[in-house]
């Protein structure tokens, strides 16, 4: 009984809180700040590996990065990030490493982000992402670190 109510409230929250900021593809040379969402609830994987990789590679490029890596305790009843963990305003790139469209925290963070360019690993309803880099293998088989490296290669090709 709780699940349908929660899903209804999630849809309402997405509709109410969704960002209306325009988004488009940006070359990496135009990116000055980024937010990387690492799925802290992914099973069988250490999210710290992807978080460290994202911090290191963006720092090497001179891009300010904030890594969001929420555990279950960092989410509210609906599955949204707690206010203290929220995505900052005014970022250029939002990158989600969540492999499943069922990860509501990633979908909500992406939808509400005011980033000028959004990229992710799976297609979400309403076309939230400007760029989707899906694994050629079965969904979710790549680690988040492997997915980050692959997405970064695509981002480097955008002129």
Regions found by a protein language model. Name each.
Residues 1-34:
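Short N-terminal or domain-adjacent regulatory/targeting segments
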Residues 25-26, 35-63:
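Histidine-anchored nucleotide/phosphate-binding helix
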Residues 32-33, 64, 117:
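Residues at the starts of beta-strands that form the adenosine-phosphate
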Residues 36-39, 68, 96-97:
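Conserved beta-strand segments of the P-loop GTPase G domain that flank and frequently precede/overlap
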Residues 49, 101, 143:
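Soluble or luminal CAZymes and related metallo-dependent hydrolases
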Residues 64-73:
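A short beta-strand-loop structural module common to alpha/beta enzyme folds
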Residues 72-139:
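Active-site and donor-binding regions of nucleotide-sugar-utilizing enzymes
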Residues 126-159:
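Active-site-proximal region of nucleotide-activated glycan assembly enzymes
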